[in-house]
């Protein structure tokens, strides 16, 4: 049995497959009277949809969303909200030659051993395509959190492959590469083109920031803010590691340098990434995520099939050379979901 529900108060349940008729989500625990239209949801979904840049997958999906329930007079009612997205640009025949093969880096091997019946087309239910549902739900959470608390979620690609990309300005970020350095633009473009030309893929490092989060969000022992953030983010395909604040860099520091000194005006530094004892400090929440190279590559690979026979194969189809570019919008969305869940729980203490 699949576990498809995320969240405690504000919940999301996802359904669908990469090459099925539709993908969709059911959102529960949403407060009433939030203004919400198809356009609000579409704006967010467009940030991650395929086919908008030559540097990502060429699969062209309109990703046109449709809200089925939970809205009346252009506002949320408090009832479950159902949103669907049709799958239009499917090429299932690209997977016929590998339907019995366990692709390295994919979920085929584990899914088959657990369920014995999997949809091999584009990864089926395990496909990153279902992250469009996460982004759909974030249209509600981002809007609610900004309007009521001024909370903002930002991010940028810090590294692609071996290429480190220094941050220059938020104004430089666009959806094609999601980098914040205009000087590195052409270098990154050439690098991705080269990796794509040789049929391989590359990983990425992304920095994420949550701004204006109030003090007191999170819990002291279990259900810490940092543990829930990590849990939500690790539910995104391809993310293999997470760093909060200067957690990794900090192993080189002495305690006298790592400790964030507190003054009457606030903290002098933010090595802890805005979280102490599992609870937000009021500073920016700083997170870094590490994305593995895309598993689907066009280079010949070796594996075994369902019959335990050795095989050599090539993956066809259309895939991202660097999935990290599109994961940015999904990661920002995931952060908004976990913060929404915490905020609603936090407010319940005031009743």
Swiss-Prot record:
What this protein needs as a cofactor is:
FMNH2
Quickly give the catalysed reaction: 5-O-(1-carboxyvinyl)-3-phosphoshikimate = chorismate + phosphate
Pathway info: Metabolic intermediate biosynthesis; chorismate biosynthesis; chorismate from D-erythrose 4-phosphate and phosphoenolpyruvate: step 7/7
- Quote the protein name from its UniProt record: Chorismate synthase
- Report residues binding FMN: 125-127, 237-238, 277, 292-296, 318
Cofactor comment text: Reduced FMN (FMNH(2)).
The protein's assembly and partners: Homotetramer.
Q: Which gene encodes it?
A: aroC
């Amino acid at each position: 049995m699949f576990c498809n529900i995320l969240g405690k108060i504000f919940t999301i349940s996802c359904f669908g497959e990469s090459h099925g008729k539709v993908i969709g989500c059911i959102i529960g625990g949403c407060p009433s009277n939030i203004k919400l239209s198809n356009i609000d949801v579409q704006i967010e979904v467009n940030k991650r949809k395929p086919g908008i840049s030559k540097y990502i997958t060429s699969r062209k999906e309109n990703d046109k969303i449709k809200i089925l329930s939970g809205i009346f007079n252009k506002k949320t009612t408090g009832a479950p909200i159902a949103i669907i997205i049709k799958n239009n640009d499917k090429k299932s025949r690209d997977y016929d030659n590998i339907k019995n093969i366990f692709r390295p880096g994919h979920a085929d091997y584990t899914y088959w051993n657990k369920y014995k019946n999997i949809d091999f087309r584009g990864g089926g239910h395990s496909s990153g395509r279902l992250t469009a549902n996460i982004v759909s739900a974030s249209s509600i959470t981002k809007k609610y959190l900004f309007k009521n608390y001024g909370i903002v979620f930002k991010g940028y690609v810090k590294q692609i492959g071996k290429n480190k990309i220094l941050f220059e300005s938020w104004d430089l970020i666009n959806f094609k590469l999601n980098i914040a350095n205009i000087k590195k633009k052409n270098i990154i473009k050439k690098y991705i083109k080269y990796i794509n030309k040789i049929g391989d893929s590359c990983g990425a490092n992304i920095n994420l920031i949550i701004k204006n989060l109030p003090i007191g969000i999170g819990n002291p022992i279990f259900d810490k803010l940092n543990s829930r953030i990590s849990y939500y983010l690790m539910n995104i395909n391809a993310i293999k590691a997470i760093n909060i604040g200067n957690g990794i860099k900090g192993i080189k520091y002495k305690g006298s340098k790592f400790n964030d000194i507190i003054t009457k005006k606030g903290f002098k530094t933010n090595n802890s990434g805005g979280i102490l004892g599992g609870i937000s400090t009021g500073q920016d929440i700083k997170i870094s995520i590490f994305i593995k190279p895309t598993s689907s590559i066009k280079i010949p690979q070796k594996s075994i099939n369902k019959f335990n026979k050795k095989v050599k194969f090539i993956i066809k189809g259309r895939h991202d050379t660097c999935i990290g570019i599109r994961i940015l919008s999904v990661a920002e969305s995931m952060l908004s979901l976990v913060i929404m869940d915490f905020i609603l729980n936090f407010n319940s203490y005031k009743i």
